[in-house]
Swiss-Prot record:
May participate in the recruitment of G-actin to the host nucleus. Its main location: host cell. InterPro entries: RNA_ligase_dom_REL/Rnl2. It is found in: Host cytoplasm. This is Protein Early 65 kDa. The gene is HE65. GO terms for cellular component: host cell cytoplasm. Keywords: Early protein, Host cytoplasm. Pfam families: RNA_ligase. It comes from Autographa californica nuclear polyhedrosis virus (AcMNPV).
Length: 553
């Protein structure tokens, strides 16, 4: 989860007065399911306006909307007013990868952003002109230096300094630097020596004087509008020489993939780096998906309520990352407590894969050795260790995963803790579903992870209608692999027609359920005999001909 709170109002822009409130934008990231629904219902991620307890204006924005706003230049506040320390995850830990992505995204979109800043009308009041002054100063800064300013405050931009230099206007309507030095605006050369280490320069003293006048919020003067009209024309003339940037559909694609939790926030030029590979988002099992699992063997693991954590081996270096964020330097959840053991296991795996692979797993336990603050909602009182890592997948450079069963064996052999796996027929699993943990009997069970071939789903304990996941029993429900093999000599896929003939005769099939029987038998032996789509087509063709032949009726 992402939580970013930034000030986008007069305080951030440097023209606030004592009575000014604060204008906040709060960005959060919706879950995958909400974003999927947003594709058909744009109202789901619509901005929401409110007031906080202090009466400040608050706009709630989904992160996807904020990122697209930067890309298009139409609502770039997230990139313009945020600082590195503003980017946090739900644990309050710095999200450096997202900050770097937003910074790069802003660089790509700067021309579109400054065109947006130029579109506002010239208003006939001091406050409106100060708002416009911010826009024009920002645009002029970019045209002069070809980069974003170090600060978003008007005076700091004019003097080309960052927020470490404090420039304010006192009660006597004088500009003061660092609360000590008063600037003499009648000194027209634009240079102001503050001390032996700091001299400030400004190219337009007249603009400084206009700022002071506007900050007094006095009676409107026509000459102000005339100044802004002339200034606007000068900027537009300069912008005529700045070409429109090309559309970046590749970046838009990556933003969408990030919203779907299929990728972290990464620019296209970086997406093939192994440190930015993340574990694919897992969909919820629901009624609409049960048909793909009916009559098939599934592998089930308990879903642990920890923190998704990846260990990356790349160029003989081991680094770490959370769900969507690469964390080469951050001490996520104080994982240093088990870091030595993790790296020992990774080095053992490196002997098998050489270099360029990722181990995905779950950090479980507490943020501290005293066990005072659980990592997540569920408190696993059965766990003796203050922090433990359960590994569950291995991904190679390029995105390919090691087959799941093979990966479990490899992870266990090198010393990783793994989550026990159990095999069931899907129909039996949902019929006897029980949300009780075998790993942690004294703690609630968050749910299950269910795998079938390349399919993977999660089933949480709060699923509303479990009965809808069950498979209605058909006329051939009693057929099992064990029954067939004990009554029919079957060794491999070459015996499939023999099996089909046996089942056809045993079940006394009618015309309307011939295909139902075929699908039932095919799925029973699909994994065991390694049957594929071509096998299905060839066998079904023979089966249809067999059904037409009276000698089998």
């Amino acid at each position: 989860m992402v939580y970013i709170c930034i000030d986008t109002g007069s305080h951030a822009k440097g023209y606030a007065v004592e009575s000014s409130d604060t204008d906040y934008h709060i960005y959060t990231k919706c879950d995958r399911e909400t974003f999927e629904k947003f594709i058909d219902n744009k109202e789901l991620l619509k901005n929401r306006h409110a007031k906080d307890e202090s009466g400040n204006d608050v706009k709630y924005v989904d992160l996807y909307t904020g990122l697209i706003g930067i890309l298009t230049g139409k609502s770039p506040e997230l990139s313009m007013f945020s600082k590195r320390e503003d980017f946090k995850d739900k644990y309050g830990i710095e999200n450096l990868q997202l900050y770097e992505f937003v910074t790069k995204l802003m660089t790509v979109s700067m021309v579109k952003i400054i065109y947006t800043l130029m579109r506002y009308k010239i208003l006939n009041n001091a406050k409106g002109l100060l708002q416009l002054m911010f826009n024009y100063v920002y645009v002029e800064y970019y045209l002069d230096y070809k980069r974003a300013p170090k600060s978003t405050k008007i005076l700091n931009m004019l003097f080309n300094v960052g927020d470490e230099i404090k420039i304010t206007m006192d009660k006597n309507n004088q500009l003061v630097v660092n609360d000590l030095n008063v600037l003499d605006l009648n000194k027209n050369n634009g240079g102001y020596k503050i001390d032996e280490t700091l001299t400030l320069f400004v190219k337009n003293v007249k603009l400084l004087k206009l700022y002071v006048k506007l900050m007094q919020r006095g009676e409107y003067q026509q000459e102000w509008t005339e100044y802004f009209q002339q200034w606007k024309q000068q900027l537009q003339d300069r912008l005529h020489h700045v070409p429109e940037p090309p559309e970046r559909t590749d970046i838009r694609h990556n933003i969408v993939m990030y919203a779907l939790n299929e990728r972290g926030p990464v620019m296209p030029e970086d997406e093939n780096k192994i440190v930015y590979q993340i574990y694919p988002s897992v969909s919820h099992l629901d009624q609409g998906k049960k048909g793909t699992l009916a009559d098939k063997e599934i592998i089930v693991q308990e879903k642990l309520d920890g923190c998704n954590f990846r260990i990356i081996c790349n160029q003989n270096k081991i680094t770490y990352g959370s769900r969507n964020t690469y964390r080469p330097d951050g001490n996520f959840m104080n994982y240093y407590r088990i870091r030595k053991d993790l790296e020992t296991c990774m080095r053992s795996l490196q002997a098998r894969f050489n270099d360029g692979f990722i181990v995905y797993g779950e950090l479980m336990g507490w943020k501290d050795d005293a066990k005072t603050t659980p990592i997540n909602v569920i408190n696993y009182v059965d766990q003796k260790e203050s922090l433990k890592y359960y590994a569950y997948e291995i991904q190679l450079y390029g995105g390919e995963f090691v087959p799941f069963v093979e990966a479990q064996e490899l992870l266990t052999n090198v010393g990783f803790n793994t989550i026990p796996c159990h095999k069931y027929l899907y129909n039996d699993f949902v019929e006897r579903l029980n949300f009780k943990s075998l790993m942690f009997p004294q703690s609630p069970l968050e749910g299950f992870i269910i795998r079938c071939g390349n399919l993977i789903y999660k089933l949480k304990s709060d699923y509303k209608d479990l009965n809808k996941l069950k498979i209605e029993k058909g006329p051939f429900e009693w057929l099992t692999c064990d029954y067939i093999k004990s009554n029919c000599d079957a060794i491999d896929k070459s015996d499939m027609m023999k099996i089909l003939i046996f089942c056809y005769n045993m079940c006394k099939v009618k015309n309307y359920n011939e295909k139902l029987l075929f699908n039932k038998v095919f799925n029973l032996f699909r994994q065991q005999f390694n049957l594929n789509h071509n096998d299905y087509k060839n066998l079904y063709k023979q089966y249809v001909n067999m059904c037409k032949c009276t000698e089998y009726k």
